[in-house]
C-alpha cells in the first residue's frame, strides 16, 4: 500500500490565549482507497505516567473524550498491559450514535535513556458486544498514542488515528469530520490534566 507524506493541516496553541503555550500541530496523510489518517503532536506539562493513566483508564476517559457516553471495561486492565473495552459516542442529529469494541495495549520502554509509552487501540469483534440496531458500529483500524518523557513534568505526545465512523456518511464527509480530531483530543486531554 503506497502512502503519501504527512501534510500539515494546522498549527495552533495548545491552550488558546495562554502566552508561550506549546504548539499543537495537526497533520494528515491520504491512503488511497481508505479513510484519511490524522496525527497530532504537542508537549504536555505533565509526567508520562499521569498522562498514560488519563489516556487508558475508563473513568478518566469519560471526563475528557469528546462525546463519549459509555466506556465499559470488558476484560483485562490497563495496568496489565492489555484490555478490551466497549465505547459509545453520542453524536449530533441527524448522525446516529456510534459504538466500538476495542482491544487496547500499553507498552512501556526506555528510549534514548528516557521513558516511552505507547498505547495502541484498534477495533475487534466480541461475542458479548454484538452490533445493536439503535447504533452504528464504527471501525478503528488504528489509533496510537506515543508518549516520550522530556523531563519529570514534561512529555511529548504524538497521537495518530484512522477511524471510519461507519454508516452511510460519504468518505469525503468522514474525512472532514475527523479533520479536527487530533487538535480537539490534545486540547481535551490537556484540559483534563490541568483540572484533575
Segment roles from a protein language model:
Residues 1-196:
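Eukaryotic helix-grip
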Amino acid at each position: 500500500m503506497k502512502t503519501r507524506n504527512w501534510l500539515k493541516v494546522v498549527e495552533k496553541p495548545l491552550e488558546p490565549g495562554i502566552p508561550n503555550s506549546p504548539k499543537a500541530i495537526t497533520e494528515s496523510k491520504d491512503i488511497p482507497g481508505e479513510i484519511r489518517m490524522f496525527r497530532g503532536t504537542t508537549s504536555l506539562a505533565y509526567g508520562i505516567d499521569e498522562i498514560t493513566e488519563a489516556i487508558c483508564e475508563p473513568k478518566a476517559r469519560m471526563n475528557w473524550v469528546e462525546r463519549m457516553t459509555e466506556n465499559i471495561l470488558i476484560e483485562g486492565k490497563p495496568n496489565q498491559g492489555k484490555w478490551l473495552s466497549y465505547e459509545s459516542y453520542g453524536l449530533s442529529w441527524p448522525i446516529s450514535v456510534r459504538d466500538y469494541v476495542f482491544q487496547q495495549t500499553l507498552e512501556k520502554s526506555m528510549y534514548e535513556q528516557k521513558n516511552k509509552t505507547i498505547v495502541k487501540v484498534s477495533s475487534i469483534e466480541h461475542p458479548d458486544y454484538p452490533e445493536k440496531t439503535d447504533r452504528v458500529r464504527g471501525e478503528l483500524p488504528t489509533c496510537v498514542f506515543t508518549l516520550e518523557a522530556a523531563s519529570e513534568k514534561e512529555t511529548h505526545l504524538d497521537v495518530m488515528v484512522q477511524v471510519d465512523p461507519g454508516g452511510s456518511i460519504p468518505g469525503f464527509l468522514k474525512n472532514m469530520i475527523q479533520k479536527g480530531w487530533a487538535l480537539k483530543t490534545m486540547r481535551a486531554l490537556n484540559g483534563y490534566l490541568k483540572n484533575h
